[in-house]
C-alpha cells in the first residue's frame, strides 16, 4: 500500500527537478508527457504565456488501438506531432514528466520524432 504512494512521490520529486531545467518558450515549446495506468497524454506547452498549444491522448477518437499500450503511445506521439506541425511547431523540448525514458514514454517520443518533430 505504501509503495505506490512512495513511487508517485518520487516521480513528482523527479519531475520538479527536471522542470527546473526544462522550460518551453514560444519558439521552442515543451512536449509534456503524463502517463496513467490505462492511458497516456501529451501536451505541447508554451511556459512563457502558460498556454497549451497542442494536445493529444490515447482517448482521442483519432486513435483506435487494438494492440498494446506501447502502440497507443506511439500513435499519440505521431498525432501530437502532426497537430504541432500543422500549427507551425517543429522544434520542442521533451519533458518526460519524471518517468523513466522507457516503454510507453520512449514509444511516444519515437512516434513524435518519426512524424517530424525535432527534439
From Swiss-Prot:
One of its GO terms (cellular component) is cytosolic large ribosomal subunit. GO terms for biological process: translation. GO terms for molecular function: 5S rRNA binding; structural constituent of ribosome. Keywords: Ribonucleoprotein, Ribosomal protein, RNA-binding, rRNA-binding. Coiled coil: none annotated. This is one of the proteins that bind and probably mediate the attachment of the 5S RNA into the large ribosomal subunit, where it forms part of the central protuberance. Part of the 50S ribosomal subunit; part of the 5S rRNA/L5/L18/L25 subcomplex. Contacts the 5S and 23S rRNAs. HAMAP family: Ribosomal_uL18_B. Belongs to the universal ribosomal protein uL18 family. NCBIfam families: L18_bact. This is Large ribosomal subunit protein uL18. It comes from Clostridium perfringens (strain 13 / Type A). The gene is rplR.
Amino acid at each position: 500500500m505504501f509503495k505506490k504512494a512512495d513511487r508517485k512521490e518520487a516521480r513528482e520529486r523527479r519531475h520538479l527537478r527536471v522542470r527546473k531545467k526544462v522550460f518551453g518558450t514560444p519558439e521552442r515549446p515543451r512536449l509534456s508527457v503524463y502517463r496513467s495506468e490505462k492511458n497516456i497524454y501529451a501536451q505541447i506547452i508554451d511556459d512563457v504565456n502558460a498556454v497549451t498549444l497542442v494536445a493529444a491522448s490515447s482517448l482521442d477518437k483519432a486513435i483506435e488501438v487494438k494492440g498494446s499500450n506501447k502502440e497507443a503511445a506511439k500513435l499519440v506521439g505521431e498525432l501530437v506531432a502532426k497537430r504541432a506541425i500543422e500549427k507551425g511547431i517543429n522544434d520542442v523540448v521533451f519533458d518526460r514528466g519524471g518517468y523513466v525514458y522507457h516503454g510507453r514514454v520512449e514509444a511516444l517520443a519515437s512516434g513524435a520524432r518519426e512524424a517530424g518533430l525535432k527534439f
